[in-house]
Design a protein with these regions (language model features):
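Surface-exposed, charge/polar-rich loops and edge strands
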Residues: 1-176
């Protein structure tokens, strides 16, 4: 139908001082993949440094991303190499390929991934042991987003969480 030819969007200038981009962290329900096994497999794919939760948060920007496990163990992670793949420099892509698909097999339905843009909420969920693991990401740089888009690259879903947002129901326009 004609109505399906259109999509609603919000346009915000990249130079707008109010533009904020948050990361969207990944929460993992691992199915039958145990923590010890996961850590061992991740350690083969990436460089892992065990840290406290506070250190993970304070030093996160110096690393590709962080991970928290149900046991309370926390790590900072980096690629051992990007094999010439520019996408592996993007934390969400490396996490998706090496951990979510590579270890937890979420692309095969062997684990469930949920998303949360608020670090405080992620930390609370992990403290309450609601998930097996969490991938804590850095806020994406706007220039990285533009560079990858300019190369025709697609970032993993929920790589970014942009503000400002239009309130749901705030704008009504009958599309017929």
């Amino acid at each position: 139908s004609d109505a399906k030819q259109f999509g609603l969007c919000t346009m915000v200038s990249q130079d707008d001082a109010g533009l904020v981009i948050w990361p969207t962290h990944r929460l993992i329900d691992a199915g039958d993949i145990g923590e010890t096994s996961a850590i061992k497999k991740i350690g083969k794919a990436m460089t892992m440094t065990e840290v406290t939760e506070e250190e993970m948060e304070s030093r996160l920007k110096e690393h590709l991303f962080g991970m928290m496990f149900r046991s309370g163990r926390c790590f900072l992670l980096d690629n051992t190499s990007d094999d010439g793949n520019v996408m592996m420099r993007l934390d969400t892509y490396a996490a998706q390929q090496k951990i979510l698909y590579g270890v937890y097999k979420s692309d095969e339905g062997k684990s469930k991934i949920s998303y949360d843009a608020e670090l405080g909420s992620v930390k609370k969920a992990m403290a309450e042991k609601k998930h097996d693991a969490a991938i804590v990401l850095n806020a994406p740089c706007l220039q990285t987003i533009w560079d990858l888009a300019g190369q025709g690259k697609r970032m993993p879903k929920k790589t970014t969480f942009f503000f400002p947002k239009i309130w749901s129901g705030w704008v009504f326009y009958r599309m017929e």
